Amino acid sequence: MGSTEQTTEILLCLSPVEVANLKEGINFFRNKSTGKDYILYKSKSRLRACKNVCKHQGGLFIKDIEDLAGRSVRCTKHNWKLDVSTMKYINPPESFCQDELVVEMDENNGLLLLELNPPNPWDSEPRSPEELDFGEVQITYLTHACMDLKLGDKRMVFDPWLIGPAFARGWWLLHEPPSDWLERLCQADLIYISHLHSDHLSYPTLKKLAGRRPDIPIYVGNTERPVFWNLNQSGVQLTNINVVPFGIWQQVDKNLRFMILMDGVHPEMDTCIIVEYKGHKILNTVDCTRPNGGRLPTKVALMMSDFAGGASGFPMTFSGGKFTEEWKAQFIKTERKKLLNYKAQLVKNLQPRIYCPFAGYFVESHPSDKYIKETNTKNDPNELNNLIKKNSDVITWTPRPGATLDLGRMLKDPTDSKGIIEPPEGTKIYKDSWDFEPYLEILNAAVGDEIFLHSSWIKEYFTWAGFKDYNLVVRMIETDEDFNPFPGGYDYLVDFLDLSFPKERPQREHPYEEIRSRVDVIRHVVKNGLLWDELYIGFQTRLQRDPDIYHHLFWNHFQIKLPLTPPNWRSFLTCCEQNGPGISQECKTT
């Protein structure tokens, strides 16, 4: 087993002033303490960065005066040229790609350049691929991001979401899972759960599993926000959760091992995995934006990744200003196309033998979310696979529930008719009904909770949340299903500069957001101390903002940095009872 845990190394820090002064195009920087040089490329859409070292023979890059577009740099040793906007060498063409660094903004709008170390941990203790027998390695698609892998005499399952909703009540399964899904889970030797989002960490699914096998081994990465941070609150009895370090092979048996890697954009919560059996690698990048900081193994046997888009409330839940229906439709169309092209290019660069798009098969099926369902179009996996096949020799697989890919057969002969076994004729592929009521009842139970009889819950909750010293005023409005004010619901302001709750907006200049939230979901989130992804990614809000600025610190805090334990409502209610009615506004816990 490898002995070096993968860590994040800070290579360069830029102050907020230096970030504000970055010019469009190429920027050169030196870390004075280390003497190392770096290049940052700024465009309207993103920042890219790399070490100022030519891959050919380690020369230093300088500005390419022949490039009028201002995108390329020239090596001082042999005149090799690098297009920093794409990180590809253009002289000589088709030679190398420059390794990118992770660009991360800090809480003060400063900038960090980060590198994962070691960058390619899967290269430790390499193994040569052995020939696979037919049927020795089989991958069966269950639904969304859930795969059942037979690896010799071991079985491994990825991200089991097989019943119930995700993100409160906003996402429901598009595909009908095979009827034997629970048996498959119970027979697994181990389960990998990539991150804490409820389309991957499904407590309704795990509750069913825990009733039969509470001791099933579950593996997660050592993320800053623990994947199972809410296990005790969930009531699900699982007794064998294993948190493993990044970038270290975990040996299952003599032929099987796996390695969990972090995401370069969301290392605090997102992970991906490499599974290796007899030297054949299966790469699952799941939802990672830049898995392993963009450094991934090439020519793996099988690669799978998300593809669909639409996993955000933006822009569907926004209104006012530019957010017309025409603007939204054009934005969504453009973004989906960009994602499709990015995935196709990634597959072309990595050259896996087989590629499978998955982890995007969800639908906004509750009738109250009809607008979201119609507006939030997703990418078609077949369109992506056709695009991949145009530009490479990669074999593609669009999975259907219960379909099984035989890796040994496909690697030996991709035309083998038994390489992919489709589900039997007549098998139900798409769900046409969902059991809404049990899950909506859980949410609705929070509406009448005693907590909300006392208006001081507002101060209690936002004090617990711990976000302050930021110039933003938010108006929170509880609503009905159609986002109209809920009769008797709360409508209040929060000034996060001093964490006060004014009756009117302050006179000073301040950014302003209005957040309308369905009362059942917001109260469920507040009562249980849940992350606001339930609201935002679950399409349970409608938002307006002035000016039209994304407040990263605010949303990042409420989506990922809330306390790990919920508010102490029992103590709060005791305090309110002791103080009596009429003074609950002053009630607070210690």
From Swiss-Prot:
Keywords: 2Fe-2S, Cytoplasm, Electron transport, Iron, Iron-sulfur, Metal-binding, Oxidoreductase, Transport
Cofactors: [2Fe-2S] cluster
Domain Rieske per the UniProt entry, residue ranges: 14-112
The protein's enzyme class: oxidoreductase
GO molecular function, one term: metal ion binding
PROSITE patterns for this protein: RIESKE
Catalytic activity: CMP-N-acetyl-beta-neuraminate + 2 Fe(II)-[cytochrome b5] + O2 + 2 H(+) = CMP-N-glycoloyl-beta-neuraminate + 2 Fe(III)-[cytochrome b5] + H2O
CC cofactor note: Binds 1 [2Fe-2S] cluster per subunit.
Broad class of where this protein is predominantly found: cytoplasm
Record's GO cellular component terms: cytoplasm
GO BP terms: CMP-N-acetylneuraminate metabolic process; N-acetylneuraminate metabolic process
Enzyme Commission identifier(s): 1.14.18.2
Gene3D superfamilies xref list: Ribonuclease Z/Hydroxyacylglutathione hydrolase-like (3.60.15.10), Rieske [2Fe-2S] iron-sulphur domain (2.102.10.10)
Binding site for [2Fe-2S] cluster: 54, 56, 75, 78
Pathway assigned in UniProt: Amino-sugar metabolism; N-acetylneuraminate metabolism
Keyword Repressor recorded: no
Subcellular location: Cytoplasm
Pfam short name (any one): Lactamase_B_3
Protein purpose: Sialic acids are components of carbohydrate chains of glycoconjugates and are involved in cell-cell recognition and cell-pathogen interactions. Catalyzes the conversion of CMP-N-acetylneuraminic acid (CMP-Neu5Ac) into its hydroxylated derivative CMP-N-glycolylneuraminic acid (CMP-Neu5Gc), a sialic acid abundantly expressed at the surface of many cells.
Family: Belongs to the CMP-Neu5Ac hydroxylase family.
Protein name per the record: Cytidine monophosphate-N-acetylneuraminic acid hydroxylase
